[in-house]
Structure formats: structure tokens, C-alpha cells
Amino acid sequence: MTMELDTILCGDSLNMLKALPESSVHCCVTSPPYYGLRDYGMNAQIGQEATPEEYISRLTAVFREVRRVLRPDGTLWVNIADSYCGTGSKGDTRDPKYPQGRNGQSISLCQAVRGCKQKDMIGIPWMLAFALRADGWYLRTDVIWAKGNPMPESTKDRCTRSHEHIFMFTKSRRYFYDWLAIAEPIAPTTALRKKAGRGVGKYSAPVPGQPQTQNINKPREKGSITDDMISPVRAKRDVWFINTVPYKGGHFAAYPPLLAETCILAGCPKGGIVLDPFMGSGTTGLAAKRHGRHYIGIELNTEFCSLARERIGGDTH
């Protein structure tokens, strides 16, 4: 089966995924609709289920198809945030005058959540992570997306939410992961410490009767460490400080391109194919295009399909 690349398929994600060939994409980067956040008025939409369990069940079914489509060495990156139990009354989540963004929540969920009390955090991200792990995925890491410019909240009895989760899953024990593509530069003080031979080897002081050695590449006497022996980078940490980016389009929940780019650089080889079953405004496709990867997007909302195509096609980054 010939698969069209660099395209956005309009329709239900589960049905569209079933039409894609097995083991055909290298990586999936996505942010599914959050639970109870916004009603887009679509019959098959995800996020407005009666219970969190139903929401998680539907997402698990979608990602089961993603696993089928993913190559054996592929990775899945899922951006997801939590929801709170409310007072039991529902607000109107469809008024465009109140786009509360990725942190907002206009629908009360208290009456639908078993075991949750009013004002409880539901635990949606970990419910999803454990469900996907139980369904066969390897749960490899939980990245914290820390926002320097979070959406303000009116609450006075807890901290304002300023982070979301990015879970990395894999289909197999061994998989493609380019750690150097997203590596971080080491601090100048770290380089000086390593060059001085302090705190970088097996021992912090000489073994009695032996010269002090350090294990940069292999044991060497103290003072013999040169600049070319010291790696200028380190593996990326699991807290990513990335600000949200304003977007003038009609999609209220667009995540920043840098977030998608980081996942793609690590999880998809150059020339590979990135899948997003919840394409929204097209951020994943935009990031893939900018870095020499192909993309396949799926989006239920026809308006967002048009928006994403226009956004990706007009990008000159």
C-alpha cells in the first residue's frame, strides 16, 4: 500500500489509523484533547466523555492503533495535562469569548468521577500512562514541560499550575533515540571541574600508594585531562523549560513548536515519518517539516484541517 506523506487526513482518528499500513511510521508526537477542557461540538470528539475511565479507554484504543502503525523501533510522545473535580455544575465550554487555553477548565467533573471529592485532582496523566503500559507499551520516561508563562488561575488555595506531562512510550525494548540531537551544553563550571579532575572519576581522592586517576574516557593520572577529552554536552534532563507561544489561529490549545521539535529530533530519524492522530492546528507537522521529516496528521475538525494545512504550507521558518 502506497501511503501519502506530508498530508492531513480529516476524520475520526481511530478510523483513519485503521487505514494506515502496519509498521509504517517512525514516530508519533501528539497532544490529545484534554478531559473536560473544551467542547468543540463534534459528534466523535474525545474529551467530553461521561467519566475519566471512558476517556482513557477511548484514548487507549486510539494508541493501540498507533502501536500497530508504528515501526518496531518507533517512539510515542504524548503531551497531557490533568483536570480537577468541580462543584457538580457544568459551564458552557463552547463560547469563543472565553478561550481558556491549555490550563483552563470550564466543565465541572465532580459528579462523574468515582472516588474523587470536590476539588480533587483527578490524575488523568498517570491514568493514561498506566493504561497504555498495561496495553503493551513500554513506559520509558515522564518529561515535565515547565512553562515560564502559564495561564493565570484565580485559585487562592493551591499553587497555579505551570506544568504538563510528556510521556515517552516505545513499542519495543530497543528503539531509535538520538540523544545527541537534543543534548544540552554542559555548564562552564562543570567543564572546569572535569578538567581539574575533581569529582569525575571513581574516587575523589587518591588510593593510598597509587597515583590519582580519573575516568573520563579511561583512567588517567590527574592533570592529564585535556579539553578534547571533555564532552561539551550532557544528556537532556527530563524537565523542559519551554514557554507557551501565542497563536492567532482558531485553535485554542496549540502547543509550542519547540516542544514538538524536541520530541521529533530525538525520536525520528532524518527523512522519517512523524504521525499525529490529533493534529489540531498542525504544530507537529510544522515541526517535522522544519527538520526534514515527513508527517501524517489526522484531525476530526474540518476547520482545523484547513487551518493546519494553511499554517504548514505558509511556514518559511
What are the functions of these language-model segments?
Residues 1-317:
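Core catalytic lobe of class I
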